[in-house]
Amino acid sequence: FESIWNKNANPTSTDFAISAICSILENGEALKKNLSDLKIRNNLLKSATVAGLAFSNTTTAAAHSMSYPLTIHYGIPHGVASSISLLPLMEINRKLIKEPLDRICNNNELTYDELKQTIKDIPKGVVPYTLDEWGIPEDQLPTLAAESFTKGRMDNNVVDLTKDDVLGILKELYSE
């Protein structure tokens, strides 16, 4: 998703990102039901590679920038830390990424609300996915928000985010 809502997005990066996202949406829940299915695992490995191709065209943006203090201070694994904010960021960036979101929804036969729910469901039962579940004290959210501004990452987001915006996202991610 970060390659889609990135100021450096281009048709190639967007196509790679949409391909990776659609494959993850198609295979994520299936893997939870059958962890030993090598075909599904292979599909997800290909998705990760294609997502990497998208990033190689754009670099990363707000989700990665916000992930760094989560990993450094609380040991949240990189993949979780960099994906935990995707839903609120998708909503913030939604108006500027309508066409790619429509393609993702159409390719997966989902409404926008179903897309959000599918994304939310993928990590359920697999990894903790709220900041509270990771043991982050709520009074640390302002500090995390202040530390979330990595030059060359946060400023790639198509919507310019303020510290208050990031604090709002972190509060949204705190608990369900």
Language-model segments: which ranges?
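Alpha-helix N-cap/helix-start motif at coil-to-helix transitions, marked by capping-box chemistry
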Residues: 11-22, 60, 80, 95, ...
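Short, amphipathic C-terminal "tail helix"
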Residues: 140-176
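Gly/Pro-rich interdomain helix-loop hinge
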Residues: 70-140
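Alpha-helix C-capping/helix-to-loop hinge sites
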Residues: 3-8, 31, 51, 73, ...
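Carboxylate- and glycine-rich phosphate/diphosphate-binding segment that chelates Mg2+/Mn2+
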Residues: 1-58, 157-158, 164
